[in-house]
């Protein structure tokens, strides 16, 4: 069956650009420009780096195999982010999130400490905004930073 989607496959690499992070098969449209949604099959290979991020579109997922811990913001009474908390989502879980919802994913591990891939059916809505990360800033707390700036700054940090 995967041969049916071989020309609809995209491998997304981790933030360093070196390690395959996610394999995405486009079930519906591979190249959508103005269509309001898309449906893909995801195989998550490694955990996100442990930094809260949002997405450019609202999204939904149904976990088919495996699962993950989803880390979401822990907020102070005033509403600002002070850390994160986590919840397990396993096979059969169906969830929907807004583009502004922050999270990061942590895959389960086997007895040898290797991450167990997670398969999910994924829905992404129309692009609503740019996406980014919550960055911890000394003496300030957390602030949202655009993904391009975050990734550029991160590459500089990796070289030092």
Language-model features: where?
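Short acidic-glycine-tyrosine-enriched beta hairpin
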Residues: 72-105
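A short, N-terminal "cap"/entry segment at the start of jelly-roll beta-barrel domains
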Residues: 1-38, 81
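Mixed-charge, glycine-accented linear interaction segment located at domain edges/termini
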Residues: 136, 142-152, 158
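Conserved short histidine dyad/triad with adjacent acidic residue
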Residues: 39-55, 99
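A short hydrophobic beta-strand segment most commonly corresponding to one strand
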Residues: 112-131
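Beta-sandwich/jelly-roll carbohydrate-recognition scaffolds of carbohydrate-active enzymes
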Residues: 33-37, 59, 71-73, 89-90
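Short, conserved beta-strand element in jelly-roll/cupin
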Residues: 55-70
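Histidine-centered metal-chelating micro-motifs
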Residues: 49, 95, 100-111, 129
């Amino acid at each position: 069956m995967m041969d049916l989607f071989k020309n609809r496959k995209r491998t997304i690499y981790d933030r360093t650009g070196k390690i395959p992070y996610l394999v995405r098969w486009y079930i519906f449209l591979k190249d959508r420009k103005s269509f309001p949604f898309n449906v893909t099959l995801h195989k998550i290979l490694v955990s996100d780096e442990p930094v809260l991020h949002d997405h450019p579109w609202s999204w939904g997922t149904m976990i088919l195999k495996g699962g993950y811990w989803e880390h979401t913001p822990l907020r102070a009474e005033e509403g600002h982010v002070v850390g994160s908390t986590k919840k397990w989502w396993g096979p059969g879980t169906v969830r929907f999130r807004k583009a502004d919802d922050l999270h990061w994913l942590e895959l389960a591990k086997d007895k040898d400490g290797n991450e167990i891939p997670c398969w999910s059916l994924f829905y992404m809505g129309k692009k609503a905004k740019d996406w980014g990360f919550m960055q911890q800033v000394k003496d300030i707390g957390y602030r949202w930073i655009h993904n391009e700036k975050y990734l550029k700054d991160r590459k500089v940090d990796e070289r030092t």
